[in-house]
C-alpha cells in the first residue's frame, strides 16, 4: 500500500456506535383500571426532542427523548409514557460542517427503533394495546430546525 493510500485510509470518515442505552423511562396510567373500558377514540399527543453532547474529541452522546400522552375523547388521561434513549457514537475524520447532520439525523435514526420498541412494550405492559409509533423523517426535522434557526438569526440582525 502506498503512503497516499495509507494516509487516505487513516483519514477516512468513521461513524461507529459505541453503546446504546435506556437513560430514563416513566409510565403512568392514572385512571386505571377504569381507563381500560374507555370506548371513545383516544387522542394522542407526541413530543420528541434530540440532544447531543460532545464527550471528547471523537465521541458524542445523543439522546432521543419521546413523550406520549394518550387521553380519552372526554380528556381523561389514559396513559403517559416518557422515554429517554441514549447512544454514544464515535464520529472521527468527519468535516466539522457535517457533524451536526450526523448528530441530528443519523444518530436519531439509529435510536428511534429502540425508542419505538420501549414505548410499545411499556404500553402493552400497562394493559393497553401496543402503541406503534410512525417512522420519523429526521432529515426533514433537522433541515426545518436549521431554517428556523437561520430565520431567527436574520430577525436579530
Swiss-Prot record:
Its main location: cytoplasm. InterPro entries: SecB (IPR003708), SecB-like_sf (IPR035958). Keywords: Chaperone, Cytoplasm, Protein transport, Translocation, Transport. This is Protein-export protein SecB. Gene3D superfamilies: SecB-like (3.10.420.10). The keyword Cytoplasm applies. NCBIfam families: PRK05751.1-3, secB. GO terms for molecular function: unfolded protein binding. GO terms for biological process: protein folding; protein tetramerization; protein transport. One of the proteins required for the normal export of preproteins out of the cell cytoplasm. It is a molecular chaperone that binds to a subset of precursor proteins, maintaining them in a translocation-competent state. It also specifically binds to its receptor SecA. It is found in: Cytoplasm. GO terms for cellular component: cytoplasm. Belongs to the SecB family. Homotetramer, a dimer of dimers. One homotetramer interacts with 1 SecA dimer.
